[in-house]
Each structure stands twice: as structure tokens, then as C-alpha cells.
């Protein structure tokens, strides 16, 4: 039986597909955080301003209730936005992980037509207690993955942003 293994960490750090998508997801995550933080600061500022004016008796009771209801709606909208953006980000991350797994499996299927391995294992952390380096095909796999990788125009544009 012919066996080989691939270092997952090396694929994650050297495969261009991973690098590109990691950068895109990192930028997207940062944009989400920045958007939510800015809206949170604006809401806090509006709430502080409201409190100050309430203490100065600048509003009638009806005005204060209307403004407070508006602030509560803004807070609810912010929470809904947070939930929506988090869900969208998770969906995109899941899609990336699926595409990554599919690209690796597709490459290994083609690669293995010539190599004829019975088993190709993934080595991540210490999931393999011992493996002789002679069975390590990581460099070949990473080189082959990178050679086959053709980023979409959409991805290239997102990476360059």
C-alpha cells in the first residue's frame, strides 16, 4: 500500500488561493468592524446628547419619548445590521472553505492518477504522531496547486483593493 501525507499548514501559508482569500476575508472583516464601530459611536453620541438635553429640560415629555423611541430603533437597526453582516461573512467564509477543499481534492485526484497512492493523509498539528519525511508530498502538492490556480477577475480586483 502506497501512502503519502500533506502538511495542511504549508498549504494554508503557501497556496496562492489561500493567501488571496485570506486577504479578501481579512479586509472584509475589517470593513465590517469599522462600519459597526462607526455606527455604534454615532449612536452613543446621539444617546449622550439626548441625555444631556433631557437633564437640561430641553424637551417636552412627548419629544423626549419620540427621540428615545428613535434611538431605540437605531439600536435595533444596528443589531440587525450586525447580525446580517456576520451571517454574510460566515456564508462567504464557508463558501471559501468549500472551494478550498474542492480545489485540493480535485488537484489530488488528478495528481494521484500518475502517483497511484492508496492513501493521502492530511497532517495538521499533531494528528499524525509519526510520519517519515519520505512520505511527505507537501511541496509537490503546493507547487501543483499554485501552478493550476487561476484567480477570477473578481477575486483579483478584491485583492488589489
Where are these regions (language model features)?
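Amphipathic, charged alpha-helical segments and their helix-to-coil junctions
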Residues: 1-161
